[in-house]
Curated annotation (Swiss-Prot):
Positions of the UniProt region annotated as Disordered: 1-57, 657-706
PROSITE patterns membership: BHLH (PS50888), HIT_1 (PS00892), HIT_2 (PS51084), MACRO (PS51154)
Gene Ontology biological-process annotations: DNA replication; purine ribonucleotide metabolic process; single strand break repair; sulfur compound metabolic process
GO cellular component terms given for this protein: nucleus
Name this protein carries in UniProt: Transcription factor bHLH140
Keyword Transcription: yes
Principal cellular location given in the protein's record: nucleus
Subcellular localization(s) per the UniProt record: Nucleus
Assembly notes: Homodimer.
Low complexity: compositionally biased ranges: 13-23
Domain Macro residue range list: 511-690
Record organism: Arabidopsis thaliana (Mouse-ear cress)
Length: 912
């Protein structure tokens, strides 16, 4: 066969295919193996069915491509051409087998001169290379003309030189790529055409069975390429159907569009019908687009369940301006679901009010946000060019850190719709911004309290395989083994193996072995990126990262260790020294990052776990001299320690209340009613945040309800009361709420850590309203405050706290201040701020508890104390102004006054 004469052709040229095809047909004519004659099948042509029309276009495009690839395909009908394609794939498979095993033969028999080994005519076959006879029928059919003895003069030059071996490698790769391309096009045509179900079954059996013995890592990874379920998320008019049609057109991956508007034989159907159609499409080997609005978790949940080890679930969020969506919906005609005209505007508005943006922890492996037409075009092109064996990186991409305001309401926008330009999305975007500034905004309902915004995730590098030179095969086995062992213990938490190199061998090995064991790829997967910039650059949210450290737990040494210490700054080294000074091989140490650490602030990383693995590098300490029995044992211990450390973090965080990254309402020194600057700020910003919640609770309504009012309250001063009575309306600012208590951040904290513990009881406006029957509530508030102190001190053990009440509060609703005594805050600006926390105007919680228990009420101090001189809270030295006072406080290390050191008024860690 000319096809096997490697000297006569360039495998990288286009002529290779024609050469092999002519050889193939010449062989078939010589052996009398002719094609079976079949009648031509035609495709359905129903002009009323959009789905059928799209299917015809896709089949036609694929058919033309396949005709150009299959030898003689241009002159064949569909059935014959598919049959020929199947045979051609088998032929290529035989060639792959042949060239792959020639490499093995060369490695075993290579000499300095031509090879003299000559197997007999009956020996040249799979058994010669130690294989079963699985390929024997193929070789019997297609290998006639191949020399049966390698001593044949025409083919003897194949053996003995490196150049020849390289030709085998090149030819092997080329044939496999051609085979995969053919399989993809056959899958599309047969999968799209119901008439060819029997050909599909035949092709699957013949092609897939022929590939069972191909075990190279590259082929395993290719054959395991996953189908994709893509959920399009957006209101009517956001362009979901257009996205699908454009992405599917001329795509090399077989797709199916699932649209509820036409799922019932061209008519509107149900969610259940969409699920069934999606399931059927996946079984047929297609990836699917879910063309529904999918605006909230409930709508998405059942479609996400379609994912698993075999399928990836992606989300494409079409977050276009509301005006653009409304304008498109109103103006369009002939819509599949008949949602057009004036009715469409109201529907869009109603849907937007219940919108919940998707999160990775719902089960998505990839989320992509599109805020403009350009973003949408990029996403369309990405999915359009995605081949049958291609994959996309996991993570969250394109998300902008927008405020929590949703798109403006239709009733306030509708008057402007007619003025919206017909087609310019840029102008529409500008209009949106103006409308946002002119109209009140409605908040999007966030996830229910208690559900984590981010799935607990550990990102870890491969331990010991870089500088410590541990064997990659053995290391990959241990990684997969330990990951599989711990996943069942971690609940919803995830493990992510990270490497900086896209061509990383350890990532490929682990990915292939995890796939073989059917490990859930949503909970354990690989990721390419910088482990110190996973969120900012890769869109992957990880709260814990592992560091492959050295025994001294010191920066330096290059690699991951140096990168993590550099990114975290001196805070990590200081925090590490609190936990340990050295580390033994096989051990790990969990280090909480302080909130001041750059990794904590920029990447959301709360903990670093240092782990030390075994060393096989003779130039590094504790070299094991290639003792892999001990090395594997130590590496297993290292991963066990690492995953157990992560498990402890997950369990500890699950016991603590959810914290919000957003700040909350303030009530501290700046809340004193005489502080005009504070009042202006609060009226200007806080009123916007609580206006909607106060609409039904106006000041007049409250006063007319018969509830006790200890003073006349300004409107802004009612914010704490509103939050305490209705915490579910303020989930963006609430850190924790119980039956009797709500915890929030102080909007303008006067120290590094400053939270408020609010009582939820009516008629408790301030300390003067407290009576003995409220003692249990006060004790509960005190205990909750201590819990938050403990949490903050876990982050930074040097912090010292004080818990107490202002004698005369500036905001309605009894609240306990939990404040660190560093007073390091830009929000502390004047004398009233300082004196409200450092004089007897501030009543310690322990004293209030004693007074209420003994005398039935708490003592309150005069507001005149706020006008006193400025004195250091430690040494009590006097200072003329706030800047000089703050400068002194930063450097003052004097002991606190005696009265604060008594009765547990100060809460500090024992080692402080």
């Amino acid at each position: 066969m000319d096809d096997f004469n490697l000297r006569s052709e360039n495998p990288n040229s286009s002529s290779t295919t024609s050469s092999s095809s002519s050889s193939f047909h010449r062989h078939k004519s010589e052996t009398g193996n002719t094609k079976r004659s079949r009648s031509t099948s035609t495709l359905s042509t129903d002009p009323q069915s959009v789905a059928a029309r799209d299917r015809r276009h896709r089949i036609s495009d694929r058919f033309k491509i396949l005709q150009s690839m299959v030898p003689g395909g241009a002159k064949m009908d569909t059935v014959s051409m598919l049959d020929e394609a199947i045979s051609y794939v088998k032929f290529l498979k035989a060639q792959i087998w042949y060239h792959q095993n020639m490499l093995l033969f060369i490695n075993d028999h290579e000499t300095t001169s031509s090879c003299t080994y000559s197997p007999g005519a009956g020996e040249f076959g799979p058994k010669l290379f130690g294989y079963d006879d699985d390929y024997a029928p193929i070789m019997d059919t297609y290998s006639q003309g191949v020399p049966l003895t390698v001593a044949d003069s025409k083919y003897t030059p194949w053996f003995g030189s490196v150049d020849d071996e390289q030709e085998h490698v090149t030819y092997f790769k080329y044939r496999r790529a051609t085979r995969h391309a053919l399989r993809g096009h056959c899958n599309c045509i047969i999968g799209e055409t119901e008439e060819f179900a029997d050909q599909r079954e035949k092709m699957e059996v013949q092609i897939e069975e022929s590939g069972k013995n191909q075990t190279s890592p590259e082929s395993i990874e290719a054959d395991k390429a996953k189908q994709i379920v893509v959920l399009l998320i957006g209101p009517p008019g956001s362009g979901k159907s257009t996205f699908c049609d454009t992405a599917m057109r001329s795509s090399h991956r077989p797709w199916s569009r699932i649209c509820q508007d036409i799922v019932n034989n061209g008519k509107a159907g149900t969610k259940a019908q969409c699920l069934k159609m999606a399931t059927d499409s996946l079984r047929e080997g297609k990836s699917v687009f879910i063309d529904r609005c999918n605006l909230d978790r409930e709508q998405r949940s059942e479609f996400i369940k379609l994912g698993g080890p075999e399928f990836e679930v992606h989300a494409v969020v079409l977050e276009l301006p509301a005006q653009v969506c409304i304008s498109r919906s109103v103006k369009r005609t002939g819509h599949e679901g008949n949602l057009q005209g004036g009715r469409a505007a109201a529907v869009v508005n109603k849907m937007l009010q219940s919108k919940e943006l998707p999160k990775v922890n719902e089960g998505f492996s990839r989320i992509m946000f599109c805020y403009s037409d350009a973003d949408v075009d990029n996403a369309v092109n990405m999915y359009n060019k995605l081949g049958p064996m291609d994959t996309l990186p996991s993570g969250c991409f394109g998300e902008k850190k927008l405020d929590t305001k949703s798109q403006p309401g239709i009733m306030k926008f509708f008057k402007k719709v007619s003025a919206l330009p017909a087609s310019s999305s840029n102008e529409a975007t500008n209009t949106t911004r103006k409308a946002d500034e002119m109209t009140a905004n409605v908040r999007v309902s966030p996830v229910k309290l208690g559900s984590a915004d981010i799935v607990p995730t550990l990102a870890f590098p491969s331990i010991s395989t870089a500088d410590f030179q541990f064997d990659l095969e053995k290391a990959s086995d241990i990684i997969v083994e330990k990951a599989e062992e711990f996943l069942s213990k971690l609940g919803t938490a995830r493990l992510v193996l990270v490497d900086l190199s896209r061509g990383s061998k350890i990532l490929s090995l682990v990915k292939a072995k995890a796939s073989q064991k059917n490990i859930d790829s949503a909970k354990f997967f690989t990721f390419v990126g910088d482990i110190t910039k996973l969120r900012s650059e890769g869109g992957l949210h990880c709260n814990v990262i592992a560091n492959a450290t050295n025994w001294r737990l010191k920066p330096g040494g290059g690699g991951v260790n140096a990168a993590i210490f550099k990114a975290a700054g001196p805070d990590l080294e200081t925090a590490t020294r609190v936990r340990a000074n050295t580390l033994l091989p096989g051990k790990a140490v969990v280090v909480p990052l302080p909130s001041t650490c750059p990794l904590h602030n920029a990447e959301g990383i709360t903990h670093v776990i240092h782990v030390l693995g075994p060393n096989m590098n003779p130039n590094r300490p504790d070299n094991l001299n290639n003792d892999y029995t001990k090395g594997c044992k130590t590496l297993r211990e290292a991963y066990t320690s690492l995953f157990e450390g992560f498990l402890s973090v997950v369990q500890d965080q699950s016991k603590l209340p959810k914290r919000s990254s957003q700040t909350a309402v303030s009530d501290s020194g700046e809340d004193i009613k005489e502080d005009s600057e504070r009042n202006k700020k609060y009226k200007g910003s806080q009123d916007k945040a609580v206006t909607n919640n106060l609409e039904s609770e106006s000041l007049e309504d409250t006063r007319g309800s018969g509830k006790k009012m200890s003073k006349g309250w300004n409107t802004w001063a009612l914010a704490l009361h509103s939050i305490a009575m209705h915490p579910e309306r303020h989930e963006n600012v609430v850190l924790e709420y119980l039956d009797n208590i709500v915890v929030i951040n102080d909007q303008y904290p006067k120290a590094r850590k400053h939270v408020l513990v609010l009582a939820r009881q009516e008629s408790l406006d301030g300390l003067e309203d407290v009576r003995k029957e409220n003692l249990q509530l006060l004790q509960e508030m005190h205990n909750v405050g201590l819990k938050w102190v403990d949490r903050f001190q876990n982050e930074d053990a040097s912090l010292i706290f004080r818990l107490g009440y202002h004698s005369v509060p500036s905001m309605r609703q009894l609240h306990l201040h939990v404040i660190s005594q560093d007073f390091n805050s830009d929000s502390l600006k004047n004398k009233k701020h300082w004196n409200s926390f450092t004089t007897s105007f501030f009543r310690d919680s322990v004293d209030v508890l004693e007074e209420v228990n003994s005398q039935g009420k708490a003592n309150v101090a005069s507001e005149d104390l706020l006008k006193g001189e400025l004195r250091c809270n430690r040494c009590r030295s006097a200072h003329p102004n706030i800047p000089k006072l703050k400068s002194h406080v930063r450097s003052c290390h004097s002991q606190f006054p005696d009265h604060l050191l008594q009765n547990n008024r100060l809460v500090a860690r024992a080692e402080t």
